[in-house]
């Protein structure tokens, strides 16, 4: 995995998320980040003037690359008091939480009554194109692994292939080669096309006490394999997203209870108009 490329994508996505956050919450607001990874985005949020606490599992994929004081937690209970934060933020994380539905209650707990949640989540398009990219990635990784046996430098992709060969039985290895693995915690690589669609994410949020304030995309095209990496610029990836679909949803949520409270406190305009008409 090209960490510089991943970091560049996350920077571009966070710029978009920051626009959503800044339009709703002032600088200096408190943020809880779930799945902080290497801490890149937590650092960027801090530089933008927000107060950030970022949490992740101790054995997360990017734990060896942390650039921010990520706090370890058990994946269930956020070590923070009730109503501690103005904003909950995650980037490509919720799909990796097996108990994603019940975890929404924990996000509700640590958010203030008027808090918002901003989540970046993979799309159905990302899943489709990641399935398609599996085989070009295998060719690339296999070629790099072969060059490594001839004394060349072994790339990250070649390391993935080598580990797959070492750790799997023949049946598992054939399956891993022929089929793209699932990315998240629900279904398989094919059914994730539905699991990652808005038809699954939107009801999940609405059924767990949220109101969807807005839903957009990151406006970028990429796959889970990053076969071309920086050979495709961000500008090219933005253009491709219009043709092939964007890779991430951007959801902005508020507590449904807060939405109801705001509605209840608003003046009953329609009733007032009717009353005047009756007079």
Which residues make up each language-model segment?
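A short SAM/SAH-binding and catalytic strip from SAM-dependent methyltransferases
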Residues: 87-98
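Conserved aromatic-histidine-acidic binding/catalytic patches
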Residues: 5, 9, 33, 37, ...
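Helix-to-beta-strand junctions that scaffold the AdoMet/dcAdoMet cofactor pocket
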Residues: 97-98, 111-113
